[in-house]
Amino acid sequence: MNYEYYYNNVPGQGLCRNNLIYTSLISTDKKVFVQWYHNDTEYHQGKNQVVDPKKMQEKWEREILFIQQLVGTGIAPKILKVDPRERKIFLAIDGPDFWEQAGCDQANYNSVLPDWQDQMINIIKAHKDRGWHKYSMHPSSYFVVDGKLKSINYFFTYRDTEPNISIADVESHIYTTRQDEMRKHLNTLGIEWDKPQPWLLMDQLCWESFSTNYPAEFIERVKCLK
């Protein structure tokens, strides 16, 4: 099977890398997505941010830890293969990601999947029920397979039993535009950038920062989840 780099075609920006951590690959028949935990300079267009090998290894280990726990739940895509030597995860998909199918525009989400809000809420609630805090919540972190959302990108996920972290600890893999959105809410939420914060407060900041990617009513629904 042949693979190629996978990008999101963002209006006004053109082809953009799919994430800041790994190198995204897709099969030419658009049926397999590969998370390749490798710092590929060509794919990242010289804008590599996670260049510390230890950090990359940690992200790989988190991805494997969490996504393998979802096998059989229907929450994540089917894992076709894991190559620990190459640090690759092969996932069964059915075309481009949710955001890409919507033309990278939240106005089109309903046309891709009319009940996307309910489906995404159910996935987020399932994470909460497991005591997980997942911060890679961009709409490109979902694929649609047989009419069902499938969640990926667990490299930015923590258990509520883990020590708290600060934003500064993880800013290397947060887009600068996302950081700008986060800074708008620091004072309101009483958050200091370089000090560890309670997980629930970090959850709230995360969702406040996604106001340009999701409708306001959806974000309010998420914030009400217990």
Segments predicted by a language model, with ranges:
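Protein kinase catalytic-loop region centered on the HRD/HxD motif
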Residues: 122-132
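Short, flexible/disordered intra-domain loops and linkers
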Residues: 42-58, 103-108, 162-169
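Hydrophobic residue at the +6 position relative to the catalytic HRD Asp in the kinase catalytic loop
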Residues: 137-144
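Conserved structural core of kinase catalytic domains
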Residues: 56-62, 71-117
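Protein kinase-like catalytic core scaffold
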Residues: 32, 75, 89, 150-151
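AlphaC helix (C-helix) of the protein kinase catalytic domain N-lobe
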Residues: 63, 67-68, 124
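C-lobe/activation-segment region of protein kinase-like
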Residues: 132-133, 145-226
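ATP-binding glycine-rich loop module of kinase domains
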Residues: 6-64
